[in-house]
């Protein structure tokens, strides 16, 4: 980001920030608000007039420096919206969420409006002829006319609860903040042109963003995502804060309110950082890292730019570990370890990962960003992501040339261990997707976007899934309600886990792993834990010691040793796979090559047929989110114990 020069205050303040960060790394961090008082912010934050992060439409030469193919692609996207209809998000569709649990119909209309506006704005910035201005005006006006900028699933934050939005009480959710950001960037980029249409356009933008976002967030401390009253925070915190910060920096004209707002944003971000595991692990999974750790980076990058580099905590160990998490969770290609509400396949944000790596001076992370850019064909004729996210699109466009010239490097580390999150991953051969890959988790059953999955494992072979974590279906009203664990994808019986005496694992913080151990060496890596406490009393489990081992270049071994207080039903072990299983006899199950993958070899599961009887289930998939990872169907392998002992042990082997 570019800034106009500001008188230097000296190196001392940057050193103070870094030293404060390092000194408090083991306690309550307050990395930002601890050192950055409102008085200090007044000295270092650039004024509204001086902060110039990206070229405006009038700086035509700067926009023409973008790759020609990308410029052409952006203009084509804008042209599709010429004279477009701005579909109205109807009140009856808003009520879908409370009537039938559907959140998708309203979101489709709302998100489409914002994507259209962003596409038109970028097209106008590149072309600069005024051809898209009337459609931009229509987009601004229709969005400003909406009663609520958020989505039906989040309107319950208002005092009158779920249902229709209360126009008298604006509340701030993820997408209200996104909308404020979109309009703020539109005002910044096209301000003079909009004034040429009518000064009332920018006045309307300021009025709506002020009353819906800026004034509300400054006045209220009770939004749970702020964490200011001790609430547990998640990705909502940095996601909203990053967009709120953009709106403050670009639209808040009153200097004291501008500083007050930034100071409050720092306090909110500190609640996120204070609660983050020191190992950098995101318990929401790699998909949500894009709006957890990566949105934290968005915020830190904005603060760095808006202070001429004087706000800089990129050397802090926690910040560095938060960045490195996403590369550690990468398995191969588009596949990632997907515990919790994460999809197995991701198109991770190449630009954010590259820039995060550059800021923390991590060459491997920068190489990963370059790898993703090549994987996604960035710089040829595409740019990644929804155009509704101008806060992500703009920095991506202006780092694109550097990003596409960087040396790509896929992160294929030998193994990793996140001790606080209790997640491990290991591969047969460092630097290669060939051979078997193992990931497993401990943790507890009250994690953010939790599944009841303590002790679950994932196995890949030559970069393709073998034993899987199914992930999550498209969100509905049930997903974040007290009926969440009625959904099959959340249940331990549909993870690679045992059902004991007819009982699945239970949700709650007390249902957790104990005695967790991890050991890695050149020939093997092992992970062990006791999962007994993840089950309710009815399961009558005294101990259930699970050990998973990757013998590099050879096999994965799953070993369970257990003691029960009572045995009423046989143990039933679930193994989930996207590969079609075949019982071949002699305690062997053949897992076929994945559908459509010609170069993948079959994999075999070996079990003691004296201990187990095996059955196979096919699970047809109708949900679009699941189909995007697993195509038309999944398979559930059920191994049922032939005896009901109080003590027992067994081993299951996975081999190529």
What are these regions (language model features)?
Residues 18-20:
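N-terminal signal peptide c-region/cleavage motif recognized by signal peptidases
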Residues 24-26, 155-156, 177, 372-388, ...:
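CBM-like, beta-strand-rich accessory domains located in the C-terminal region of large
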Residues 112-126, 138-142, 177-185:
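Non-membrane alpha-helical segments in proteins
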Residues 124-137, 186-210, 248-266, 303-319, ...:
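Structural helix-adjacent loops and short alpha-helical linkers that scaffold large soluble proteins
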Residues 163-285, 298, 397-408:
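Active-site lining segments of carbohydrate-active enzymes
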């Amino acid at each position: 980001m570019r800034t106009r020069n500001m008188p230097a205050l000296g190196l001392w303040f940057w050193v103070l920030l870094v030293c404060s960060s390092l000194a408090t790394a083991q306690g309550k961090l307050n990395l930002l608000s601890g050192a950055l008082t409102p008085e200090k912010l007044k000295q270092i934050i650039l004024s509204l007039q001086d902060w110039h992060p990206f070229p405006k439409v009038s700086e035509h030469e700067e926009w023409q420096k973008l790759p020609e193919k990308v410029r052409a692609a952006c203009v084509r996207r804008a042209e599709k919206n010429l004279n477009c209809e701005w579909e109205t998000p109807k009140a009856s569709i808003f009520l879908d969420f409370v009537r039938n649990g559907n959140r998708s119909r309203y979101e489709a209309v709302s998100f489409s409006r914002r994507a259209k506006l962003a596409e038109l704005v970028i097209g106008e910035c590149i072309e600069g002829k005024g051809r898209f201005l009337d459609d931009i005006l229509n987009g601004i006006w229709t969005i400003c006319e909406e009663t609520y900028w958020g989505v039906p699933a989040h309107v319950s934050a208002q005092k009158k609860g779920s249902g229709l939005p209360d126009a008298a009480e604006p509340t701030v959710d993820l997408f209200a903040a996104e909308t404020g950001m979109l309009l703020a960037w539109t005002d910044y980029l096209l301000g003079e042109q909009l004034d040429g249409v009518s000064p009332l356009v920018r006045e309307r933008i300021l009025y709506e963003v002020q009353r819906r976002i800026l004034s509300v967030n400054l006045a209220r401390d009770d939004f749970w995502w702020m964490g200011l009253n001790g609430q547990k925070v998640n990705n909502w915190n940095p996601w909203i804060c990053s967009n709120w910060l953009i709106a403050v920096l670009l639209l808040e004209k009153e200097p004291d309110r501008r500083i007050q707002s930034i100071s409050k944003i720092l306090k909110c971000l500190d609640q996120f950082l204070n609660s983050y595991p020191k190992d950098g692990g995101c318990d929401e999974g790699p998909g949500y890292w894009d709006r957890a750790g990566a949105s934290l980076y968005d915020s830190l990058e904005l603060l760095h730019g808006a202070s001429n580099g004087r706000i800089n905590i990129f050397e802090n160990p926690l910040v560095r570990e938060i960045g490195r998490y996403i590369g550690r969770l990468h398995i191969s290609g588009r596949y990632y370890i997907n515990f919790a509400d994460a999809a197995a396949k991701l198109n991770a944000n190449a630009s954010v990962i590259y820039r995060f790596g550059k800021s923390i001076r991590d060459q491997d992370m920068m190489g990963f960003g370059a790898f993703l850019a090549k994987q996604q064909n960035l710089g040829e004729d595409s740019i990644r992501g929804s155009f509704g996210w101008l806060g992500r699109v703009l920095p991506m466009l202006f780092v694109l040339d550097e990003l596409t010239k960087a040396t790509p490097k896929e992160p294929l580390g030998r193994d990793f261990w996140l001790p606080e999150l209790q997640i491990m991953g290991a591969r047969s051969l460092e630097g290669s997707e060939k051979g078997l890959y193992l990931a497993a988790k401990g943790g507890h059953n009250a994690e953010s976007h939790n599944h009841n999955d303590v002790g679950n494992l994932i196995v890949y072979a030559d970069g393709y899934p073998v034993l899987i974590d199914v992930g999550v279906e498209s969100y509905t009203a049930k997903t974040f309600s007290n009926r969440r664990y009625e959904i099959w994808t959340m249940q331990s019986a549909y993870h690679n886990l045992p059902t004991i005496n007819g009982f699945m694992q239970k949700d709650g913080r007390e249902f957790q792993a104990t005695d967790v151990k991890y050991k890695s060496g050149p020939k093997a890596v092992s992970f062990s834990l006791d999962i007994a406490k993840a089950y309710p009393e009815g399961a009558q489990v005294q101990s259930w010691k699970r050990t998973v081992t990757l013998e590099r270049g050879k096999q994965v071994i799953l070993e369970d040793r257990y003691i029960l207080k009572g045995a009423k039903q046989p143990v039933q072990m679930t193994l989930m796979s996207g590969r079609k299983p075949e019982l071949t006899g002699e305690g062997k199950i053949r897992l076929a090559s994945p559908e459509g993958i010609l170069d993948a070899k079959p994999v075999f599961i070996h079990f003691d047929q004296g201990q187990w009887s095996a059955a196979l289930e096919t699970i047809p998939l109708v949900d679009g989110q699941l189909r995007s990872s697993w195509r038309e169907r999944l398979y559930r392998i059920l191994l049922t114990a032939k005896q009901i002992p109080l003590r027992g042990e067994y081993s299951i082997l996975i081999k190529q």
